Protein backbone atom coordinates (compact mmCIF):
# COMPACT_ATOMS: atom_id res chain seq x y z
CA UNK A 1 0.00 0.00 0.00
CA UNK A 2 1.75 3.16 -1.26
CA UNK A 3 -0.73 5.70 0.13
CA UNK A 4 -2.71 5.67 3.35
CA UNK A 5 -4.23 8.71 5.04
CA UNK A 6 -5.57 9.17 8.56
CA UNK A 7 -7.40 12.50 9.04
CA UNK A 8 -7.80 13.76 12.62
CA UNK A 9 -10.10 16.73 13.12
CA UNK A 10 -11.67 18.51 16.08
CA UNK A 11 -11.85 21.79 18.03
CA UNK A 12 -9.05 23.50 19.96
CA UNK A 13 -7.92 21.52 22.99
CA UNK A 14 -9.50 18.24 21.90
CA UNK A 15 -6.09 16.56 21.75
CA UNK A 16 -5.52 16.53 17.99
CA UNK A 17 -1.80 17.32 17.99
CA UNK A 18 -0.73 15.03 20.83
CA UNK A 19 -2.82 12.14 19.57
CA UNK A 20 -1.87 12.55 15.91
CA UNK A 21 1.85 12.60 16.71
CA UNK A 22 1.52 9.43 18.76
CA UNK A 23 -0.55 7.64 16.12
CA UNK A 24 2.05 8.53 13.48
CA UNK A 25 4.79 7.20 15.74
CA UNK A 26 2.96 3.96 16.56
CA UNK A 27 2.12 3.29 12.91
CA UNK A 28 5.42 4.50 11.48
CA UNK A 29 3.68 7.14 9.37
CA UNK A 30 4.45 10.77 8.54
CA UNK A 31 2.81 13.45 10.69
CA UNK A 32 1.34 16.63 9.20
CA UNK A 33 0.01 19.49 11.37
CA UNK A 34 -2.14 21.68 9.12
CA UNK A 35 -3.05 24.04 11.95
CA UNK A 36 0.64 24.86 12.29
CA UNK A 37 0.66 25.79 8.62
CA UNK A 38 -2.16 28.30 9.14
CA UNK A 39 -0.31 29.79 12.10
CA UNK A 40 2.91 30.08 10.10
CA UNK A 41 1.21 31.73 7.14
CA UNK A 42 -0.75 34.09 9.41
CA UNK A 43 2.42 35.24 11.20
CA UNK A 44 4.19 35.66 7.85
CA UNK A 45 1.40 37.81 6.40
CA UNK A 46 1.13 39.81 9.63
CA UNK A 47 4.89 40.45 9.58
CA UNK A 48 4.44 41.96 6.12
CA UNK A 49 1.94 44.45 7.56
CA UNK A 50 -0.98 42.68 5.90
CA UNK A 51 -4.43 42.00 7.30
CA UNK A 52 -7.36 39.83 6.29
CA UNK A 53 -8.77 42.82 4.39
CA UNK A 54 -5.82 43.05 1.96
CA UNK A 55 -5.32 41.34 -1.40
CA UNK A 56 -3.13 38.40 -0.38
CA UNK A 57 -2.85 36.34 -3.56
CA UNK A 58 0.58 37.66 -4.61
CA UNK A 59 2.04 37.02 -1.15
CA UNK A 60 0.43 33.59 -0.88
CA UNK A 61 2.00 32.56 -4.19
CA UNK A 62 5.43 33.28 -2.68
CA UNK A 63 4.89 30.90 0.24
CA UNK A 64 6.64 27.54 0.38
CA UNK A 65 6.05 25.18 3.33
CA UNK A 66 8.11 22.11 4.20
CA UNK A 67 8.29 19.59 7.03
CA UNK A 68 11.87 18.47 7.67
CA UNK A 69 12.61 16.03 10.50
CA UNK A 70 9.38 17.01 12.23
CA UNK A 71 10.08 20.75 12.07
CA UNK A 72 8.03 23.28 10.08
CA UNK A 73 9.82 25.59 7.66
CA UNK A 74 8.27 28.52 5.82
CA UNK A 75 10.37 29.80 2.92
CA UNK A 76 13.37 27.88 4.35
CA UNK A 77 13.02 29.49 7.81
CA UNK A 78 12.25 27.27 10.81
CA UNK A 79 9.06 28.53 12.49
CA UNK A 80 8.06 25.60 14.72
CA UNK A 81 8.49 27.50 18.00
CA UNK A 82 7.10 30.95 17.24
CA UNK A 83 3.82 29.61 15.81
CA UNK A 84 2.71 28.25 19.21
CA UNK A 85 1.98 31.68 20.70
CA UNK A 86 -1.56 32.82 21.50
CA UNK A 87 -1.11 35.65 19.00
CA UNK A 88 -0.39 33.13 16.24
CA UNK A 89 -3.58 31.24 17.09
CA UNK A 90 -5.72 34.36 16.94
CA UNK A 91 -4.14 35.51 13.67
CA UNK A 92 -4.63 32.05 12.19
CA UNK A 93 -8.36 32.18 12.95
CA UNK A 94 -8.62 35.61 11.32
CA UNK A 95 -6.73 34.68 8.14
CA UNK A 96 -8.38 31.24 7.89
CA UNK A 97 -11.65 32.94 6.95
CA UNK A 98 -10.06 34.23 3.71
CA UNK A 99 -10.83 31.99 0.70
CA UNK A 100 -7.44 32.64 -0.94
CA UNK A 101 -5.59 31.52 2.20
CA UNK A 102 -7.60 28.32 2.54
CA UNK A 103 -7.25 27.55 -1.17
CA UNK A 104 -3.47 28.00 -1.13
CA UNK A 105 -2.95 25.91 2.00
CA UNK A 106 -5.33 23.20 0.84
CA UNK A 107 -3.31 23.03 -2.38
CA UNK A 108 -0.03 22.68 -0.44
CA UNK A 109 -1.46 20.08 1.94
CA UNK A 110 -2.86 17.94 -0.87
CA UNK A 111 0.45 18.12 -2.71
CA UNK A 112 2.37 16.94 0.36
CA UNK A 113 -0.05 14.03 0.87
CA UNK A 114 -0.34 12.86 -2.72
CA UNK A 115 2.10 10.02 -2.07
CA UNK A 116 3.02 8.21 1.13
CA UNK A 117 1.42 7.46 4.47
CA UNK A 118 0.31 10.41 6.59
CA UNK A 119 -1.50 11.19 9.80
CA UNK A 120 -2.93 14.64 9.09
CA UNK A 121 -4.46 16.77 11.83
CA UNK A 122 -6.29 20.06 11.79
CA UNK A 123 -9.66 21.59 11.10
CA UNK A 124 -11.76 20.45 8.10
CA UNK A 125 -9.23 17.78 7.08
CA UNK A 126 -11.80 15.04 6.58
CA UNK A 127 -14.42 17.28 5.00
CA UNK A 128 -12.44 19.57 2.68
CA UNK A 129 -8.70 18.91 2.46
CA UNK A 130 -8.63 15.11 2.27
CA UNK A 131 -12.20 13.86 1.81
CA UNK A 132 -10.70 10.66 0.37
CA UNK A 133 -8.81 9.84 3.60
CA UNK A 134 -8.90 6.15 4.49
CA UNK A 135 -9.69 6.86 8.16
CA UNK A 136 -11.46 9.98 9.44
CA UNK A 137 -11.48 10.77 13.15
CA UNK A 138 -13.20 13.69 14.90
CA UNK A 139 -12.00 14.27 18.47
CA UNK A 140 -14.12 16.05 21.07
CA UNK A 141 -13.73 16.89 24.76
CA UNK A 142 -15.64 18.90 27.34
CA UNK A 143 -15.06 22.65 27.30
CA UNK A 144 -13.58 22.52 30.82
CA UNK A 145 -11.10 19.81 29.84
CA UNK A 146 -10.08 21.62 26.67
CA UNK A 147 -9.33 24.78 28.66
CA UNK A 148 -7.32 22.78 31.20
CA UNK A 149 -5.22 21.12 28.50
CA UNK A 150 -4.48 24.40 26.77
CA UNK A 151 -3.55 26.00 30.10
CA UNK A 152 -1.10 23.19 30.91
CA UNK A 153 0.40 23.39 27.42
CA UNK A 154 1.02 27.14 27.66
CA UNK A 155 2.24 26.94 31.25
CA UNK A 156 4.89 24.43 30.16
CA UNK A 157 6.07 27.04 27.66
CA UNK A 158 6.22 29.76 30.35
CA UNK A 159 3.36 31.71 28.78
CA UNK A 160 1.63 33.77 31.46
CA UNK A 161 -2.11 33.34 30.81
CA UNK A 162 -4.91 32.62 33.27
CA UNK A 163 -7.54 29.92 32.88
CA UNK A 164 -10.07 32.71 32.29
CA UNK A 165 -7.95 34.14 29.46
CA UNK A 166 -7.73 30.76 27.79
CA UNK A 167 -11.44 30.05 28.25
CA UNK A 168 -12.26 33.33 26.52
CA UNK A 169 -9.86 32.54 23.66
CA UNK A 170 -11.33 29.08 23.11
CA UNK A 171 -14.89 30.45 23.16
CA UNK A 172 -13.95 32.94 20.46
CA UNK A 173 -12.13 30.26 18.45
CA UNK A 174 -15.09 27.88 18.69
CA UNK A 175 -17.47 30.59 17.52
CA UNK A 176 -15.23 31.46 14.57
CA UNK A 177 -14.67 27.84 13.60
CA UNK A 178 -18.32 26.79 13.74
CA UNK A 179 -19.87 29.86 12.15
CA UNK A 180 -17.48 30.66 9.30
CA UNK A 181 -19.06 30.47 5.86
CA UNK A 182 -16.08 28.61 4.37
CA UNK A 183 -15.56 25.07 5.69
CA UNK A 184 -17.15 25.43 9.15
CA UNK A 185 -15.86 22.99 11.75
CA UNK A 186 -17.93 19.78 11.75
CA UNK A 187 -17.32 16.03 11.52
CA UNK A 188 -17.29 14.40 8.10
CA UNK A 189 -20.36 12.25 7.54
CA UNK A 190 -18.22 9.09 7.70
CA UNK A 191 -15.97 10.26 10.55
CA UNK A 192 -15.66 8.30 13.79
CA UNK A 193 -16.24 10.64 16.74
CA UNK A 194 -14.14 10.00 19.87
CA UNK A 195 -14.72 11.84 23.14
CA UNK A 196 -11.29 12.26 24.74
CA UNK A 197 -12.44 13.99 27.95
CA UNK A 198 -11.66 11.10 30.30
CA UNK A 199 -9.04 9.33 28.18
CA UNK A 200 -5.28 9.78 28.05
CA UNK A 201 -3.48 10.14 24.75
CA UNK A 202 -2.30 6.53 24.70
CA UNK A 203 -5.86 5.25 24.99
CA UNK A 204 -7.06 7.48 22.17
CA UNK A 205 -4.05 6.74 19.95
CA UNK A 206 -4.45 2.98 20.43
CA UNK A 207 -8.14 3.23 19.56
CA UNK A 208 -7.32 5.07 16.33
CA UNK A 209 -4.55 2.60 15.47
CA UNK A 210 -6.98 -0.31 15.82
CA UNK A 211 -9.46 1.46 13.54
CA UNK A 212 -6.67 2.06 11.01
CA UNK A 213 -5.42 -1.54 11.14
CA UNK A 214 -8.95 -2.79 10.45
CA UNK A 215 -9.19 -0.45 7.49
CA UNK A 216 -5.82 -1.56 6.12
CA UNK A 217 -6.93 -5.19 6.38
CA UNK A 218 -10.13 -4.44 4.47
CA UNK A 219 -8.25 -2.58 1.72
CA UNK A 220 -5.64 -5.34 1.43
CA UNK A 221 -8.39 -7.94 1.04
CA UNK A 222 -10.00 -5.87 -1.70
CA UNK A 223 -6.84 -5.70 -3.80
From Swiss-Prot:
An example Gene Ontology molecular-function term: CMP kinase activity
BP GO terms, sorted: nucleobase-containing small molecule interconversion; pyrimidine nucleotide metabolic process
Pfam families per record: Cytidylate_kin (PF02224)
Chain coiled-coil ranges: none
Key words of the record: ATP-binding, Cytoplasm, Kinase, Nucleotide-binding, Transferase
Main location class: cytoplasm
Signal peptide (from-to): none
Binding-site residues for ATP, renumbered to this chain: 10-18
Cellular localisation: Cytoplasm
InterPro entries: Cytidylate_kin (IPR003136), Cytidylate_kinase_dom (IPR011994), P-loop_NTPase (IPR027417)
E.C. number: 2.7.4.25
Catalytic reactions on record: CMP + ATP = CDP + ADP; dCMP + ATP = dCDP + ADP
GO cellular component, as recorded: cytosol
Top-rank taxon, per record: Bacteria
Family: Belongs to the cytidylate kinase family. Type 1 subfamily.
PANTHER family: CYTIDYLATE KINASE, CYTIDYLATE KINASE/PANTOATE-BETA-ALANINE LIGASE
Designated name of the protein: Cytidylate kinase
